[in-house]
């Protein structure tokens, strides 16, 4: 089988005294800041291994297998070894430990380099892939992203539009599950913790036909009691139950040399809280005694199914043909309490359906000087979302005042009368129902190549010609269900005006009714990539790449107006410097990326004035961001290794265009929401007395603002410490673990400074686990 990446054996170039001087300062620099994707000691053929050599890590997220040191893209890799060492159980455990990546609303949403995966428009800016299948962003809080039987997780930072295509302007997260092997193997694990969160898991595989057909199955079950109690309903607010089941087949037929096929099916069934799990902070000791008083259940019932078929055929040592087929089907029912109180005033239910089918064909070439791929991609996505809810619309004082001025009143009188009306009717209760359907078809031709201009200098290039057809339609009904103010109660002089306001209010509700026939839009984009990579010696390489990022346009539904509104694509140009280095005879890896991104035609949400629901997406923003990531890992010896990461990201809105009739805040000079400037992580593994192991790691995130603008409130910085200690043999492991070891209290999100409702970070969790392997 040909190797799709270059692993040439070269004479080592002696390091200069200057290089040694730089090296001598690296441990202090890194401990004061840097980074890392975990690596483990390489094993010699006899199994003894080199206790101070790090494993070669392969990065596959760019669809060509390259070593981490050959990859110029900024990527953080978490292997199955690190998942076990740190007792990582969910994708967000990894994101919280990754440089320039941060959580947003608890387990709902994340940022990469300060860019939110969901921002400004329905389609995401970053996508999570499971075995090559793109997961809908709407299930990031309740999808199949737990880490049981996961082989590797790659967080690709920066535009991935050339290779991944749609919805990857900020980056991509690639999860690969464990493949079947031609040997019998298995593992089983049980975990228990306080607060109660029991988990049980099993994975096993074996050959069905020796050397030709093998299978692997994995199952995990969880029954979490939750952190938040609800005295109104007498239940837990954020309890979760989930069951994940996966089956995989590997086929390498003896009669077809060079052919391999992997078939995977995952079913993930979850019952849990709504995407945002709020607690009240207007109660004593709100961090330790978490309370939610909602009378209406805030819940999610999600069934996600993912199937993939990957076929590789090595026609020769140089040529390989790959076919990747994926299908995802997600059914989701959610309910929520909008007012978050014990009063039955505002609540709702949604039914959501997401279906995606994609097919990709790639031709890989690996020659002496030229390596790369060319591919064809096609996908079809369908969504069907329905909602029924009781909504309390804040009485729009400014809109009423404008109507009164249009009728001839002066501004002062109109404002005073509008204020009196709002006192009588502070909110407008509306029964609202809607259904929106969309279908998108994406076709693309793409290529990614590396050509050796000399023994050490390589040209990097690629492109994607992307075509998307998007169709969206919606229907909505709205009905006023409250009691209007009695005009007679305001006296004979004001009664006519109050009656007129009543009619205007009913007209506003009526305007939210609408039937919008499906409309189709087509987008084309050319996304180039060009760069250079120079290998100074076998252990040191630098690179520079410029590439274009892209998010397609589409249509959004304006609830208040009952209409669709179109918006156009947005683009970025990304320039990135990379450093890849190994030191101390490959015991220390130090990698870094420095980037600058220019963002044009940014998709933002604009208000149009009727009420709080009169908004839709427009292209009005221009922004830029810059920063760096540094990552290091060092195996000091058989008994100790450490790793660290440091990220810095500075985001800035530059200007906002004027949109007719729109109310767009001029955020020029402001930072993005949930864009921490600094992220830092450090950890280490200790081994002693043959069988004892321990891991301790800490993560830091600087302060962030959940809003945008000079007066936006900020959430304080937070530092979390986690640990694991255990006893390991060849067959079994018993261990203790703790997350948020010092029980640091921190807020993930709040409506505003005065709001009693907040999303809190997880408290300290202490538990035990046992795993058996065969």
Protein language model regions, located:
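C-terminal beta-signal and adjacent terminal beta-strands/loops
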Residues: 4, 691, 700-707, 727-774
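Solvent-exposed loop segments that connect transmembrane elements
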Residues: 228-236, 275-293, 337-347, 388-435, ...
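Membrane-embedded beta-barrel scaffold of Gram-negative outer-membrane proteins
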Residues: 310-336, 535-551, 558-559, 566-657
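Outer-membrane beta-barrel translocator/receptor signature
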Residues: 124-125, 137, 148-157, 162-230, ...
């Amino acid at each position: 089988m040909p190797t799709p990446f270059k692993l040439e054996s070269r004479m080592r170039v002696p390091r200069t005294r200057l290089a040694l001087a730089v090296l001598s300062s690296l441990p202090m620099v890194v401990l004061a800041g840097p980074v890392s994707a975990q690596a483990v000691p390489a094993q010699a053929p006899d199994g003894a291994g080199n206790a101070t050599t790090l494993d070669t890590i392969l990065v596959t997220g760019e669809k060509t297998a390259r070593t981490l040191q050959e990859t110029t893209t900024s990527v953080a890799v978490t292997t199955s070894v690190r998942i076990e060492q740190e007792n990582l159980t969910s994708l967000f455990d990894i994101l919280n430990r990754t440089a320039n990546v941060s959580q947003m609303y608890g387990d709902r949403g994340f940022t990469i380099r300060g860019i939110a995966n969901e921002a400004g428009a329905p389609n995401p800016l970053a996508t999570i892939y499971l075995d090559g299948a793109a997961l809908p962003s709407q299930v990031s809080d309740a999808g199949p992203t737990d880490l049981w039987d996961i082989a590797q997780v790659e967080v690709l930072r920066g535009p991935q539009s050339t290779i991944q295509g749609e919805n990857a302007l900020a980056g991509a997260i690639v999860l690969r599950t464990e493949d079947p092997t031609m040997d019998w193997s298995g593992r089983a694990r049980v975990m228990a913790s306080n607060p109660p969160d029991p988990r049980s898991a099993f994975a096993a595989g074996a050959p069905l036909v020796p050397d030709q057909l093998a299978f692997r199955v994995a199952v995990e079950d969880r029954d979490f009691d939750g952190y938040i109690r609800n005295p109104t309903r007498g239940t837990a607010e954020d309890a979760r139950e989930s069951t994940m089941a996966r089956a995989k087949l590997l086929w390498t037929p003896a009669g077809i040399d060079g052919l391999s096929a992997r078939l995977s099916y995952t079913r993930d069934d979850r019952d849990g809280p709504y995407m945002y799990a709020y607690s009240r902070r207007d109660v004593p000791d709100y961090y330790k005694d978490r309370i939610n008083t909602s009378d209406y259940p805030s819940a999610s019932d999600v069934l996600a199914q993912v199937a993939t078929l990957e076929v590789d055929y090595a026609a020769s040592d140089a040529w390989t043909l790959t076919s990747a087929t994926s299908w995802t089907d997600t059914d989701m029912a959610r309910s929520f309490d909008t007012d978050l109180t014990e009063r039955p005033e505002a609540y709702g239910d949604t039914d959501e359906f997401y279906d995606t089918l994609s097919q990709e064909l790639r031709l890989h070439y690996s020659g002496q000087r030229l390596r790369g791929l060319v591919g064809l991609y096609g996908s079809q996505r369908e969504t069907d979302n329905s909602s029924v809810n009781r909504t309390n619309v804040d009485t729009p004082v400014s809109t009423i005042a404008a109507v009164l001025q249009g009728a001839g009143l002066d501004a002062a009188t109109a404002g005073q009368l509008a204020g009196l009306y709002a006192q009588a009717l502070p909110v407008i209760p509306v029964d609202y129902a809607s259904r929106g359907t969309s279908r998108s078809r994406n076709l693309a031709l793409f290529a990614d190549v590396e050509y050796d201009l000399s023994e050490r200098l390589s040209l990097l290039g690629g492109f994607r010609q992307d075509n998307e057809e998007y169709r969206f339609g919606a229907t909505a009904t709205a009905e006023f269900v409250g009691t209007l103010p009695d005009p007679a109660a305001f006296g004979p002089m004001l009664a006519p005006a109050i009656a007129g306001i009543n009619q205007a209010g009913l007209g506003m509700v009526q305007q939210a009714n609408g039937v919008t026939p499906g409309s189709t839009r087509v987008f084309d984009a050319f996304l180039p990539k060009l760069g250079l990579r120079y290998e100074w010696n076998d252990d040191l390489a630098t690179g520079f790449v410029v590439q274009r990022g892209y998010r397609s346009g589409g249509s959004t539904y304006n609830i208040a107006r009952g209409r669709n509104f179109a918006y156009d694509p947005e683009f970025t140009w990304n320039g990135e410097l990379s450093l890849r280095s190994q030191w101390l005879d490959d015991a220390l890896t130090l990698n870094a990326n420095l980037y600058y991104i220019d963002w044009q035609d940014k998709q933002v949400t604009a208000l149009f004035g009727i009420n709080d629901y009169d908004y839709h997406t427009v292209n009005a923003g221009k922004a830029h961001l810059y920063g760096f990531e540094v990552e290091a890992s060092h195996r000091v010896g058989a008994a100790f290794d450490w790793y660290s990461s440091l990220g810095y990201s500075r985001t800035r809105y530059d200007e906002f265009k004027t949109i007719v009739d729109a109310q767009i805040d001029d955020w020029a000079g402001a930072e993005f929401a949930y864009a921490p400037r600094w992220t830092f992580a450090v950890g280490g593994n200790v081994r002693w007395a043959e069988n004892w192991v321990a891991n301790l790691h800490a993560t830091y995130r600087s302060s962030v603002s959940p809003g945008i603008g000079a007066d936006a409130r900020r959430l304080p910085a937070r530092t979390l410490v986690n640990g694991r200690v255990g006893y390991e043999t060849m067959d079994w492991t018993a261990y203790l673990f703790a997350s948020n070891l010092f029980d640091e209290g921190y807020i993930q999100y709040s409506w505003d400074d005065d709001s009693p409702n907040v999303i809190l970070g997880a408290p300290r969790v202490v538990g035990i686990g046992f795993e058996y392997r065969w």
